[in-house]
Amino acid sequence: MKLTFNIDYRTNWGEQVFMTGNIPELGHFDRAKALPLISEGSGLHSVSLDISPATGSIEYRYFIVRDGNPIREEWGKNRVLRIDPKVGSVTVNDRWQDQPWNKPFFSTAFTDCICRPAAYDQPCDIQPGSICLMADAPMVLPGTRLAVSGSCEALGNWDPAKAVVMNNSMFPRWSVQLPLADLPQTDIEYKFLLLRESDHTVIGWDNRDNRILSVPESDGYSSLVEAGLFFENPLSPWRGAGVAIPVFSLRSDKDFGVGDFLDLKLMVDWAASTGQKMIQLLPVNDTTMTHTWADSYPYNANSCFALHPMYLRVQDLGELSDRHEQSRFDALARTLNELREVDYERVNAAKTEFTRLIFAQQGRNDLETPEFKKFFDANASWLKPYAAFCVLRDLYHTADPSAWEQYSVYAPSLIERFVDQHRNEIDYIYYIQFHLDRQLREVRDYAHSRGVALKGDIPIGISRTSVDAWISPRLFNLDCSAGAPPDDFSVMGQNWGLPTYNWEEMAKDGFAWWKARFRKMAEYFDAYRIDHVLGFFRIWQIPSNALHGLLGVFNRALPMSPDEMKYGYDFHIDTESQTRPFITDQMLGDFFGELADEVRATYLQHTGYGRYQLLDRFSTQRRIADHFASSPRDEKADRICNGLLSLVDEVLFIEDPYEKGKYHPRIAAQFTYAYRALNEYERGCYDRLYNDFFYHRNNDFWREKALWKLPPIIDATDMLVCAEDLGMIPACVPDVMHRLEILSLEIQRMPKDPSVKFADTWHYPYLSVCTTSTHDMGGIRQWWEENRESIGSFYNNVLGFSGEAPYFAEPWICSRIVDNHLKSPSMLCILPLQDWLSTDGVLRRQDPREEQINVPANSRHYWRYRMHLTLEQLLQADSFNRSISHMIAESGR
């Protein structure tokens, strides 16, 4: 069989088009054996090859080479040809696959869920003597089909009733085969169109000029393929609605005191019944470190691959043969499920006790099944070290590997022996993860069948006491912490206590760790939220001896030298005084009041001229905290401790951790006493330096860093990419997100335009997710009651009502706010369940303060919110559900 490939691509001088594929003639995807195409002029490149007729499916792709190095890749999946062995020759006319303008629609959120065909056609091989048209059309909703019509009888002579329906077996790629014998030997015009499947009513025609097809003569054996076509959808951009709820917050009649994975099937039912297309979750990875409620923080996982045992529906594993024990657990489950909030410690202890008993009773049988062996083989690379980590954590009563004696440094051979020596405990961990995986896959498949996509959450950080940091410490900067600059959530900034990433080390293997992490997530989810996407541009990095986020710097950034400050901004830095805490008598009175003299005598050293410095043993925030942690705490001790911690923040500059002798201006330095001590001219020079550094100087540098990291990572899967892009946003961020077609996050009360108080929902970008609130803030009702000073303006100027704003956010107010969001241009409107419920005066919770999931300013917050009604009750709330369905439909979603 002879294959001829043609592709239009205008190369620059010195560039050449190559192709590679899964057959020997194309090098088995080995770039060193790729096939060069010959330039035929006018941008056309061609190559012909002879292959065996029994080759089967052929996968291939093109790439561009300059000076022997690949410089450009095609976007998307490999091209696929299925050719009947009886075909003598095939000519394939390809188009270069660039990233399409509607890339999100090619994600599995659409191809496997929202636009998933009700049924797939049988694959059809390219037949002898035919023309095959292949067109990409992802945004074809269930119940509709792509068809082709044109200027000849075989294409219906432009009569839609006679249009040829295309094959969807490779959806979102559609194909149709037309016998050459049925086509006139001339140029014909044609167009793609959307038809309603039930009656072939036309929904819309290709939004472009007629296409031209040159029909060759037929010899009965040769075929032509026109590939790389693209349906220009004439319909309005698709917009959908969804709900956000953590798994632990779900409540059903079958729960064990906490939401579990199988509860999600009921949430899928509710979403589907009300016209919603997406369910957004918080991270579901295992966070067990101490077996206390402190482990409830879902962004501090002990593994980026393992699922949290808390989310296992333990009743699904079977019943205990000991009827007395089974009855005891049934009663305990009912007791825990009646609690208003999650009792993290009791729930996890009870589930662990039950699963250990059921494992002892029948778990070995599960570990002998083909399903388990398949699971183990696919996940062994992370599962074995994770299981060893869990056993070592419990054996040494700490998750800190540095306390694990000979196991503190991960050594594969040593861990293999440890696994063999603790086989029963290790197998129990395998057993739990196997069933968690099985249950979450069951939910994913069920969601697909209902046309609902599951959206996961990718935390920006990993725990320093995690499997990932233990086995691959080179990938992380373990001597510092990630966090965030000051914002509306925390005036001191945030210190998450998580290590930052060593991106240079990660890049050496093509970001393999990140790709594996995303691919694991893609086994369960079809969309994801990148937590703090700004961290891919630069991360706020805090030294290990600091506690407050105020002492952080951006990693990486372009720090300033003293000469640059002097000659560029006329600011003369005093590195001796302006990089160390600025402490004066006046400050001590302001910070400590009547305790100032005691503080001077105990913690400070006088350096002359009314200035002080902290004694060496109190010179860092870590040393101060450690000192007070070892002594009795009372109100006085707290005042002194907090005051000393704030004194350490009193600097104007912070030395760069990588380029010594160069400096970063301290974030929010204008609020320091050190800044006030400058004269007016110095403050003006400092402000110019500060504003240039944080808002202009690093933009191109950060853009380059993001475009180095993000494309290979997000292209590792076909999930829909959304991002949390709140906070101190560099000017380069919107451009990069638009270029990569990452959906932004839009929150009305956190506008990205600093000149306005509230964002305008009518002007949100299409590529965005809009929401009324997030897990880090109170819902509509709580915000309304706690922000009286701004609610009046919102009530009159945003909602359009006159008069004084009601004290409470009544259901009609919440409905107006929700309706405004639904009618926004955003592709997705995903609202917390609490805010959906706020529109119903009967169903909503009495006290909205009980609905806040997290308080970011409190690093010790207990994550325990649960919905106050069951999912079964929610599904039966007919009036409310009709109202939600109506609001969504009326908004055009």
Per-segment meaning from a language model:
Residues 10-55, 65-85, 139-185, 195-217, ...:
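Aromatic-rich carbohydrate-binding modules that target alpha-glucans
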Residues 48, 105-132, 179, 204, ...:
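Catalytic cores of glycan-processing enzymes that make or break glycosidic bonds
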